[in-house]
Amino acid sequence: MARWRNFLIPFSLAAGAAAFLTAWWIQRGRANRSALASNTEALTWQALRQLDVAAEARFIAVNGLELHTIVAGPLDGPLAVLLHGFPECWYAWRKQIKPLVEAGYRVVVPDQRGYNLSDKPRGIHNYRLEALSADVVELIRSLGHEKAIVVGHDLGGMVSWHLAMHHPQVVEKLIVMNAPYPAAFLRELRSNPAQRRKSWYMGFFQLPIVPEELFGHDPIESARRIFRQNTINQDAFSSFDLHVMATALAQPNALTSMLNWYRAAARGRSALENLRPIEQPTLLMWAEDDAVLGRSLTYGLEPWFSNLKIHTIPHCGHWMQNEAPREVNEELLAFLKMA
């Protein structure tokens, strides 16, 4: 009995200390997030001024939700919808908005559902690709347009692929940046050990609570690690840029909602089933030094496309529209000018 007592007492003390430290750590993270989120409105106006072009923030109703959306450019211009990825927000496109407006486009940049200031419905099922694509369809229609040029990066690119396949009537042209076409992604996950290793985080994101607390404990440090560690040019993100991204992470219920995109994808195979050829003119831009998505994901795509152009940007990491904005913008605008 004494032997068990000698074991149980230190074990109980250690377990109690661990529980206390865990609770303190979680509570500290919640306080950090609350402090950041409290300044959101003022920060949004500061971010809008960074665009150096007339733009407004508004909430647009789609499918029973409200999407916080940045709108700029002439009312009668062709519509361009820019879709951010994980863990970004509308501000990820800050370096593309002005060039597109100056080229005559009506530019619409939503925080997608679950992100930043947009609504965050509870439940993993609310983040399936079908729902995410339906948001974009309704957004285009609510603005009085029948179709749009759709530009997507990362998970925004996955929504763009799904939109072009299942709602082709609303997509005039398609531009995707560092988001694998689903058939290529499935092929590489099955046959390429290097890509499986790079995709480890997708499995980690299936865990409950842990990813939220890891990213949310110190949102500014999380933003710094996420955006600068997969960037060749460390000057691509200023301290202000990281503060905007961190504030998006800190919004109430945002982290769970953002991670639910990955959880929904793992529970349903909609992204990898019912694949259809894409008829619209398509530009796929790829950063050569993306640490999480290998260049082999751009190989063997021709059978799935009627009109595909692939443009690779050397010495560039995953956040290409931030790291190489001049080349991205030149290639984007040149593609849009093509008949």
Segments from the language model and where they lie:
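Alpha-helical and His/Cys-centered functional microenvironments
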Residues: 88, 100, 157, 322-325
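Flexible "cap/lid" subdomain of the alpha/beta-hydrolase fold that forms the substrate-access gate
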Residues: 2-9, 20-58, 64-67, 79, ...
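Short hydrophobic "strand-cap" motifs at the C-terminus of beta-strands
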Residues: 83, 313-316
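Hydrophobic membrane-insertion alpha-helices, especially the h-region
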Residues: 14-18
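A short, glycine- and basic residue-enriched loop/turn
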Residues: 89-90, 158, 316-317
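Conserved HGGG/HGGXW glycine-rich cap/lid loop of the alpha/beta-hydrolase fold
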Residues: 71-117
